[in-house]
Amino acid sequence: MESLRELYKIGVGPSSSHTMGPQRAAKRILELFPDALRFHVDLHGSLALTGKGHLTDYIIEKTFSPIPVTFSFKSDALSYHPNGMIVHIFDQKDQEIKAIEVYSIGGGSILFKGDMEEKPKEVYKQKNMDQILKYVEEQGISLYDYVLENEDDSFVEFLYKILDAMFQSVESGLKKEGTIQGKLKLKRVAKSMFQQAQNTRREADRERLFISSYAYAVAEENADGGQI
């Protein structure tokens, strides 16, 4: 089984497959080609058909900045997955030096094809929950101990970063007003809901409003392309 790092990821909304995945792919490519003159990205399948609404081109352009990037939107899907794209890299002579095929396969996970293809490392010997529960019972350990037994030494620090990102998205969403970007112009309500909770006397109603305001805060941050 893969590391829990593959489950918990920090990225931008509104979609793990249409923004978080493409952002991770762009970051990886930029690390390999920091001196590129420009990039051109062919968005295929679902990334092309719904990419504008999901801010796919926006997050790729933001990630590659200040290096310029242009886009082609192609409705045909690539062979492996509906969320595919091809990134063309151009050197300082404006000659294409590489074309990288990459897929955003869900949950922020990405898959490169060809010589950049990598598979997540297996860090757990057990393959399913039944095997895990049997193992922890035999060893007399908790699930938390089981995780620490298998993950690397920096995993607890990683979890604190994830927790901090969760709190930050709530706090950020509670501070903002106005409308969410996009044609629907949906009004943000988390801040007003939080203020309503503060002024509610009945404890059960107050707690329900607080919880709802936190949920709306994260949802609105996600929809508006914020970090979650």
Put a short name on every predicted segment.
Residues 19-22, 26, 53-57, 80, ...:
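Generic structural signal for well-ordered, non-membrane alpha-helical segments
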Residues 157-228:
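Accessory "access/gating" subregions that flank catalytic or transport cores
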Residues 131-166:
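N-terminal amphipathic, basic-rich helices that act as targeting or association modules
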